[in-house]
């Protein structure tokens, strides 16, 4: 298919390694410019690789003569040398784009021109300008290096004026700028593919968890309302459209504490740590997507979707620690975990904080991903995140609602149970309903008596299915509760069970979950078979002893 295409890759680290893996399947020849025995070269037996620094101008010229196309696995390269060879070989993304993005301040200025939502920032050529920025933005603020900044390196959070000299010294002689500190609730990322003709395609929004300023975990999709995920994808695509050049771009963003505002943090013009999950979770990995984009091969929105509507992924970085055996322990343990795929990068020396590999866990629910992740950590008593919420208006309802919990325990479905009053704690009810989906809940069981507004009000504020349990009160035998819950207006459904029958609510919740959890579907079939057997046993007994001698 691509026998004539020869791709030169500047950089032979783990990103280059995984790019080469994808290239092999597409029959694309790769020539790598980096040190001898770099991770990418270990898995490509070609003899034309160049053993030199990927910033060496002469080596870049030599590479260009052997290839039809140059690309990079890292943005910290010699853009002047790349620009000089563009007359004889294609470079993707363009040297101009790489030059703009590798300088974080230029990147922010560029995006600001196109009205991309960003934190406030300003230049900081000297200590006086940093002090002025502190007065303008307030404390804390973030002092950042314009260049050679990644994985938290090149950033310093300044909490008070006296820390400014220390911060400047810590960041060395590199040019600096100041960014206003934004109180965020979550860090997210979207991988965006840009084709040669400028079309852009977004992978799902992911949630990234940092540890010691290095990406530690990636949840795909992010644990956010779908509307927020879509807005993040739109912002990421809008940002990538402003640049020239094909390839994959990693767009990092913040979700602020209001849960609505999204600001762009920074862009990487290459495969990104937050996109590793795509190897197992999507039809086309970020590495293959990059190659398809720069080589002009077919690509569409289907390539960037999760493989199924129930696919969930959790990517765990394996970082070196003080324990020399840590990496091998995690690697070996991962091989016994269902749905887990191990990627080791071929790095000989394990240093603290060094990326040695990653594990991607795939399952049909985020809770199952979490459970398997705890297996990876060898947690003895793993705590599972709830997928069902059981709520009631008062503790007086507990005697009727506990049967739902009994059923969920029987099916081993994790749940949370609490009191949420529609009338006495309306703010708590609103918060509970609006955050339920993003917290990982998939079904809500709401019990209420009398006016019984709780199920309907919750259903009006969450996209999740709500099961209403009419609770028998002191008057009207619970018929008032039943009538209240079933009389919901069009567009706001509540699945209502019989009065006081929270057991059926629990069973219905399990059936809803079973539509995308095969293991739960099998358990439900077994439950139904067991009920049948109980009835058949009773029928057999009645027929044998007769009605006069029958006792239940």
Curated annotation (Swiss-Prot):
It is an enzyme of class 4 (lyase). SMART domains: AIRC. GO terms for biological process: 'de novo' IMP biosynthetic process; purine nucleobase biosynthetic process. Residues 108-295 form the ATP-grasp domain. Keywords: ATP-binding, Decarboxylase, Lyase, Nucleotide-binding, Purine biosynthesis. GO terms for cellular component: cytosol. Pfam families: AIRC (PF00731), ATP-grasp (PF02222), PurK_C (PF17769), RS_preATP-grasp-like (PF22660). It comes from the Eukaryota. One of its GO terms (molecular function) is ATP binding. SUPFAM superfamilies: Glutathione synthetase ATP-binding domain-like (SSF56059), N5-CAIR mutase (phosphoribosylaminoimidazole carboxylase, PurE) (SSF52255), PreATP-grasp domain (SSF52440), Rudiment single hybrid motif (SSF51246). Signal peptide: none annotated. ATP binds at residues 134-189. It catalyses: 5-amino-1-(5-phospho-D-ribosyl)imidazole-4-carboxylate + H(+) = 5-amino-1-(5-phospho-beta-D-ribosyl)imidazole + CO2. Its EC number is 4.1.1.21. PROSITE patterns: ATP_GRASP. Pathway: Purine metabolism; IMP biosynthesis via de novo pathway; 5-amino-1-(5-phospho-D-ribosyl)imidazole-4-carboxylate from 5-amino-1-(5-phospho-D-ribosyl)imidazole (carboxylase route): step 1/1. In the C-terminal section; belongs to the AIR carboxylase family. Class I subfamily. HAMAP family: PurE_classI, PurK. This is Phosphoribosylaminoimidazole carboxylase. It comes from Schizosaccharomyces pombe (strain 972 / ATCC 24843). The lineage of its organism: Eukaryota, Fungi, Dikarya, Ascomycota, Taphrinomycotina. The gene is ade6.
């Amino acid at each position: 298919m691509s026998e004539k295409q020869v791709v030169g890759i500047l950089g032979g680290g783990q990103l280059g390694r995984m790019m080469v893996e994808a290239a092999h399947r597409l029959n694309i020849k790769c020539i790598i410019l980096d040190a001898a025995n770099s991770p990418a070269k270990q898995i490509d037996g070609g003899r034309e690789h160049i053993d030199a620094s990927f910033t060496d101008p002469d080596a870049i010229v030599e590479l260009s003569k052997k290839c039809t196309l140059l690309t990079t696995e890292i943005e910290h390269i010699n853009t002047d040398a790349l620009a000089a060879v563009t007359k004889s070989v294609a470079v993707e993304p363009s040297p101009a784009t790489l030059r703009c993005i590798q300088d974080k301040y230029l990147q922010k200025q560029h995006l600001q021109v196109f009205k991309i939502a960003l934190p406030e920032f300003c230049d900081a050529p000297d200590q006086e300008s940093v002090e002025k920025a502190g007065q303008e933005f307030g404390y804390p603020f973030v002092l950042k290096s314009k260049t050679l900044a990644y994985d938290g390196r090149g950033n310093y959070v300044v909490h008070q004026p006296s820390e400014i000299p220390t911060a400047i010294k810590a960041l060395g002689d590199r040019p600096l700028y100041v960014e206003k500190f934004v109180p965020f609730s979550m860090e997210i990322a979207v991988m965006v593919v840009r084709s040669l003709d400028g079309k852009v395609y977004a992978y799902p929004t992911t949630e990234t968890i940092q540890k010691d300023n290095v990406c530690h975990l990636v949840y795909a999709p992010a644990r956010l309302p779908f509307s927020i995920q879509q807005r993040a994808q739109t912002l990421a695509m809008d940002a990538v459209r402003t640049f020239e050049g094909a390839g994959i771009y990693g767009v990092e963003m913040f979700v602020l504490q209001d849960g609505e505002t999204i600001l762009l943090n920074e862009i990487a013009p290459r495969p990104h740590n937050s996109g590793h999950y795509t190897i197992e979770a999507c039809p086309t990995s970020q590495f293959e997507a990059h190659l398809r984009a720069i080589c002009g091969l077919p690509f569409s929105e289907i390539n960037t979707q999760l493989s199924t509507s129930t696919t969930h992924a959790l990517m765990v970085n394996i970082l070196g620690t003080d324990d020399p055996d840590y990496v091998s322990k995690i690697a070996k343990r991962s091989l016994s975990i269902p749905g887990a795929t191990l990627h080791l990068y071929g790095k000989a020396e394990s240093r603290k904080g060094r990326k040695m590999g990653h594990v991607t866990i795939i399952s049909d629910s985020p809770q199952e991903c979490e459970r398997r992740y705890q297996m990876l950590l060898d947690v003895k008593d793993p705590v599972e995140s709830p997928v069902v919420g059981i709520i009631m208006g008062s503790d007086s309802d507990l005697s009727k609602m506990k049967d739902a919990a009994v059923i969920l325990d029987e099916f081993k479905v994790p749940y949370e149970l609490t009191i949420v009053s529609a009338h006495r704690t309306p703010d708590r009810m609103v918060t509970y309903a609006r955050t339920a989906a993003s917290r990982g809940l998939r079904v809500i069981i709401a019990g209420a008596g009398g006016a019984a507004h709780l199920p309907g009000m919750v259903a009006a504020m969450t996209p999740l299915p709500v099961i209403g349990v009419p609770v028998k009160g002191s008057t009207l035998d619970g018929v008032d509760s039943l009538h209240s819950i079933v009389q919901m207006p069009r567009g706001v459904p509540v699945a209502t069970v019989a009065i006081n029958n929270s057991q059926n609510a629990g069973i219905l919740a399990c059936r809803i979950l079973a539509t995308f959890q095969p293991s739960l579907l099998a358990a439900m079939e077994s439950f139904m078979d067991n009920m049948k057997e109980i009835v058949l046993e009773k029928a057999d007994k009645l027929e044998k002893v007769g009605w006069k001698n029958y006792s239940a």
